[in-house]
Amino acid sequence: MSKKNNLLVAASGTGGHIFPALAVSKEVEDEWNIHWLGVRQRLDANFIPKKYNLRTLNIKTPRKNIFLFYQYIEILISTFQIIRILKEKKINLVFTTGGYISAPTIVASKLLRIPIIIHESNVIPGMVTKYFGFLCNYVLLGFKKTNSYLKNCKTIFTGTPLREQFYKFNFLPEWVPKGRGPLLIVMGGSQGAKAINQILYESLEFLIKKQFRIVHIIGESNQQPFHVKNSKNYIQKKFTNEIAALIQNCDLVISRSGAGTINELIEAEKPSILIPYPDSKNNHQEKNALILAESGGSVLINQNKISKEVFEETLERIFKIKSKKGKNHYEILDLMKKNMENNNKIKSNNEIKKFINYFLKEF
């Protein structure tokens, strides 16, 4: 048996960085020894399997202005730490998905002449891709539109890798509320979304009265549980590993619009109400949401426009019953479903595996 080469996966922070990297790691783990580099006090340790040899560095949250002198000093210190790790683990290739850890990892790898692949999931590239992408051998894109923002990079459209369960059908978990009412999945990403949680709490009485069934994923942040009378149709969880099953089997998703969520909705062909995170860098969540809103598969509501009244009116419009040939159906929801079916799907995991394994020929 030939000796495996060593792949360093640098991904940290939110699920939007971690989950695509996990999907790729699982896809290539038979050909590579996986070593994972993350940041202390982030979500990393909760999600990274022990077999991926997680190492963490103490990297602070980047300031808004990437050109601040002391921020470069922090990157420089981290770069030397990563150089030591790259040498120690005899890394042959680096794959990163952005986040705090990516910039010093790219610089360190370039100094050691180790090939680098970065994946950019968002329509608008993040700061690391924008300012350090030209140092990478390839910049893999989740959306074709992103190419126009990266003129000095070698870009290839691959789509965004998803967790394997999204590529197969999953049955609805037993703990989901039973009944005939429409099933809503409400979530705010891996860290939660206070604004989405709040608007749902305000509208719970309306939702229960209308016989909606609700699964509410509040996120890993310190959200207080919310209790409501007669809540058999409402279930709240901080996190679930069964998110693919929930999205595949629900009627509508209400969520932020991170790149991972957008691609999960495309794969599941699921209609949605998207409420972009207003403070995302370069307003990238709104640009992501527009991909689905412009196709007619989603309703986009900016956070500064959302209210109890707007939220409830939007749901009433989507779930307004129309009669056709003696049968009742949700005309708007059905149209949104049809529009979601028209979005192009690509199994990105396989595409990215091809590029990673291409480098095996070089060693």
UniProtKB/Swiss-Prot annotation:
UDP-N-acetyl-alpha-D-glucosamine binds at residues 14-16, 122, 163, 190, 285. Pfam families: Glyco_tran_28_C, Glyco_transf_28. It catalyses: di-trans,octa-cis-undecaprenyl diphospho-N-acetyl-alpha-D-muramoyl-L-alanyl-D-glutamyl-meso-2,6-diaminopimeloyl-D-alanyl-D-alanine + UDP-N-acetyl-alpha-D-glucosamine = di-trans,octa-cis-undecaprenyl diphospho-[N-acetyl-alpha-D-glucosaminyl-(1->4)]-N-acetyl-alpha-D-muramoyl-L-alanyl-D-glutamyl-meso-2,6-diaminopimeloyl-D-alanyl-D-alanine + UDP + H(+). One of its GO terms (molecular function) is UDP-N-acetyl-D-glucosamine:N-acetylmuramoyl-L-alanyl-D-glutamyl-meso-2,6-diaminopimelyl-D-alanyl-D-alanine-diphosphoundecaprenol 4-beta-N-acetylglucosaminlytransferase activity. It is found in: Cell inner membrane. Its EC number is 2.4.1.227. Pathway: Cell wall biogenesis; peptidoglycan biosynthesis. SUPFAM superfamilies: UDP-Glycosyltransferase/glycogen phosphorylase. It is an enzyme of class 2 (transferase). It comes from the Bacteria. InterPro entries: GlcNAc_MurG (IPR006009), Glyco_trans_28_C (IPR007235), GlycoTrans_28_N (IPR004276). The keyword Cell cycle applies. It is a peripheral membrane protein. Belongs to the glycosyltransferase 28 family. MurG subfamily. This is UDP-N-acetylglucosamine--N-acetylmuramyl-(pentapeptide) pyrophosphoryl-undecaprenol N-acetylglucosamine transferase. It comes from Prochlorococcus marinus (strain MIT 9312).
